[in-house]
Regions:
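Bacterial Sec-dependent N-terminal signal peptides
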Residues: 1-23
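Boundary/entry segment of secreted carbohydrate-active catalytic domains
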Residues: 20-49, 57
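The substrate-binding groove and active-site-proximal loops of carbohydrate-active enzymes
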Residues: 28-33, 69-83, 121-133, 154-163, ...
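Aromatic-lined carbohydrate-recognition surfaces of secreted/lumenal glycan-active proteins
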Residues: 101-106, 150-161, 169-193, 242-250, ...
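Aromatic- and acid-rich polysaccharide-binding/catalytic face
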Residues: 136-155, 187-227, 244, 248, ...
């Protein structure tokens, strides 16, 4: 390489902290299940945003927070929510060299929070454990079949984990007999410090909806400051367990006060604020993506019909067709 060209590149990477190579980072999208079979036209936008991973999310359904039966892989579900649909999505993504995390999730009727699933008796806890095992082991088998790089054993199930820790420890052992890849669990941002089985997994998974600013339009600097109370706790977890941190979900809505309660999906929040989404997202990247103990993350969320979703008047989480998509593309770029 020409000496002056080498010197110029060294200067650039010294001047720009985000110029560090992201070749080894998990630069992911949370690929939403739909009714449809997907093909190259649906995967191309994932490639164009420089993602190298997709979370494929089959679903199980439960009637209410006290109901022990999880219904899954039925012909009443959308195609992408089932095992055959998940496999088809994975095959389409693989053709474009996208790596895979399979992340089975539960939907509680009326959208109640899964972290509050709580049985009322030992008998119903046992029923739930049997049903959840059937659900999660089915997708562990799929993960093994398709050689998924990562398998997520659950998402935001705080009370289930709290009151049945031995079940979870035993479940991980069972999963390991079926699937030989990397394991994680998607703990909510206010749950991950209490999750008891990180020592049995490969990544400390966090759904990273940490509050970072109370301002209507938080500036980049506001959000950088807001992370200062959270980052030391997160990095200490990585150090204590000697495991990398993986943001199994991250992202912000394009609304006013997007950094105050980033987890809030209230449909009544309709005041679009694209700048707020850009600033919160950029601050997250600058805070974490350059850290060696940080594995990467999956932006929430990405729909298959790219040209028909998101946009400048959309107040939801998706970054698609919004200014923040370019921010993600920039930080996801590969320095090869």
């Amino acid at each position: 390489m020409n000496y002056f060209k080498w010197l110029f590149l060294c200067f650039l990477c010294t001047a720009l902290p985000s110029c560090n190579s992201q070749e080894d980072k998990i630069n992911g999208v949370s690929f939403v299940a739909s009714r449809d079979v997907i093909d190259t036209t649906h995967v191309n936008p994932v490639v164009k945003v420089n993602a190298n991973y997709a979370a494929v999310m089959p679903f199980g359904f439960i009637k209410n927070l006290e109901h022990p039966e999880i219904i899954h892989n039925t012909d009443r579900q959308w195609f992408g929510e089932t095992r055959p649909g998940s496999k088809q999505y994975i095959e389409a993504l693989r053709k474009q060299h996208i790596k895979i995390m399979i992340k089975p999730q539960i939907w509680v009727w009326k959208g109640e929070f899964t972290g509050e699933i709580m049985m009322t008796s030992e008998a119903t806890w046992k029923e739930l454990e049997t049903s959840y095992s059937s659900f999660i082991l089915e997708y562990a088998e799929l993960a093994n079949e398709v050689n998924a790089e990562i398998f997520c054993i659950g998402t935001e199930l705080e009370l289930f984990v709290k009151y049945r820790p031995q079940f979870w420890s035993d479940l991980i052992v069972k999963i390991r007999t079926i699937y030989k890849g990397k394991l994680t669990y998607a703990a909510n941002w206010d749950e991950f410090r209490r999750t008891p089985f990180w020592d049995q997994l490969d990544y400390i998974g966090v759904d990273a909806y940490f509050p970072v600013s109370d301002n209507k339009t938080p500036s980049f600097e506001d959000c950088i400051e807001g992370w200062k109370s959270h980052k030391p706790i997160i990095s200490k977890m990585a150090k204590d367990y000697k495991k990398p941190i993986l943001f199994t979900e991250y992202g912000y809505r394009s609304v006013d006060f997007s950094g105050r309660k980033p987890w809030d999906s209230d449909h009544n929040m309709k005041d679009v604020n694209l700048e707020a989404q850009v600033n919160t997202t950029k601050a997250l990247f600058e805070t974490f993506w350059k850290e060696d103990w940080f594995a990467g993350g999956f932006v929430w969320k990405w729909f298959h019909k790219h040209s028909e979703v998101g946009g400048f008047d959309n107040p939801r989480f998706t970054p698609q067709n919004k200014p923040v998509e370019d921010i993600i593309r920039y930080y996801y770029k590969s320095e090869k």
